Amino acid sequence: MAKILAVGTVVAIASTYGTASSMTALTNAANAVATLAAGHGVAVGDFVEITSGWGLINGRIARVSAVATNDVTLEGINTTSTTNYPAGQGVGSIRRITAWTNLSQITSGLSVSGGEQQFADVTEITDRTQQQIPTTRSPIVVELPVYDDPSLSWTPTVRAASDSAVATAVRMIYPNGSRLVGNAYWSLGDVPTIEDSTLRNSVTLTFAAQPTRYAT
């Protein structure tokens, strides 16, 4: 059991990507293995964006834990359920993230909302107690309050992601070395606010797919 302080958390946006590499196979496994075309260039430790015929992992970001020629292991991508992941239907492509840009001047007010399980009411007329069954989860939204400074090196990258309305990867590294990666829609405020006599702004991330958490 550990209590992890948030001070020292590093947030980054994917600033460049490699060319997408097509899959010829994607396995059902606790850590799915993608067979890629030759010359893919993917190495152990790389983070990749997954495009897949399996909707539950489409758009997710994963770390590569092993490479054996053209077989690439996607750490933390569990596809063992053939109900959720029908065999042979998951092929697509992966795109390697080749550079990250760290965000600076994030204040201590980082907040997370969403992700809560939603339920449908299935109460029947004969029931004396309401019944519910789980459906979807609400979207995860992370708000990063920052001290406003348009000259910061990360601003053009975040602004481009905000303007494009295309999901772009985010990486959060916590002080204990654990990390979270995901694909999110970025939004950067156009007009700064004033708080405690300083200019502030807000970077909002709305996750487009389930994030992946790693202990190290």
Short names for language-model regions:
Residues 121-124, 131-150, 197-212:
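Oligomerization/assembly interface segments of phage tail-like spikes and tubes
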Residues 101, 154-183:
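Short, acidic/charged, Gly/Pro-enriched secondary-structure junctions
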Residues 37-55, 162-169:
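Short coil-to-beta transition motif at edge beta-strands of beta-rich domains
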Residues 126-130, 188-189:
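Short structured motifs
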Residues 3-7, 13-29, 37-40, 54-128:
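Small/polar beta-strand repeat architecture
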Residues 171-215:
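Short beta-strand and beta-hairpin "edge-sheet" elements
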Residues 155-156, 214-216:
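Short, charged, solvent-exposed linker or helix-capping segments at domain edges/interfaces
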Residues 47, 58-63, 71, 179-185, ...:
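Well-ordered beta-strand positions in beta-sheet-rich domains
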